[in-house]
Amino acid sequence: MSVNLNWWEHFFEGVAVDLWLRALPADHTEREADALANMLAVPAGAAVLDVPCGAGRLSLALAKRGYRLTGVDWSPEFLGHARSATGATDVAWERRDMRDLPWPARFDGAFCVGNSFGYLDDEGNAAFLRAVASALKPGARFVLETPMILENLLGHLHDRSWWQVGDLRLLVANTYDHIRSRLDIEYTFVSNGRVEVRRGSHRAYSYRELVELIEAAGFTIDRVRPWTRDLEVVSFIATRT
């Protein structure tokens, strides 16, 4: 299966957005926001960057905790949902490529979580990390969370799996390309009798590769979640040098 590496430009619309909006319960988001606040270690009122932010669930949760959020995403549909949910919270929404962050040394902290890292090619992923570093003040923290760590990914990978979210069903078919170190994924959405197929691709890195990539972008690594056999998501906490 060959996947266009610009797949993300039009993936997050329609049925994919419907599923992502319903995928996680509110209490999961609250726990995740508490963990992020702890890892970022910044006071209330601090400027925090969420990239890519999707529909803004974590930006909104952190804004309610007193932080000033900027959420960046490429999907107009995701951002439309984010804006409609903003209310009186202090969040600025920006439609941008995740490599385009034109705010030198503006933010006190930043995060990229979920499965949002690794969409791009090698240079694109490196450019994203450099852009985040440029947008952070010296000494600011960056939290990168990803399931795309080879030591963990390959032990948990299923060829096919079904997911049910409300009345939506999703079949995920995985193909790991060991030459490219990419996980190519075919998503089959089934909703109201309609079937829609989309494809995505993620670059997978070893622990060492990703640590070196983060450090080359202008960070020092503060903490990495230690490897265990059953670990599915890895969190890296880094400081802007």
Model-derived segments and their meaning:
Residues 1-43, 45-52:
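Conserved class I S-adenosyl-L-methionine
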Residues 57-100:
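Class I SAM-dependent methyltransferase SAM/SAH-binding core
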Residues 102-109:
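A short acidic, Gly/Pro-enriched loop at the edge of an enzyme's catalytic core
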Residues 113-115:
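Residues lining the SAM
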Residues 123, 143-213:
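SAM-dependent methyltransferase
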Residues 126-138:
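A short glycine-rich, Lys/Arg-flanked "PGG" loop and its adjoining helix->strand segment in the class I
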Residues 209-241:
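C-terminal lobe and adjacent flexible extensions of AdoMet/dcAdoMet transferase-like proteins
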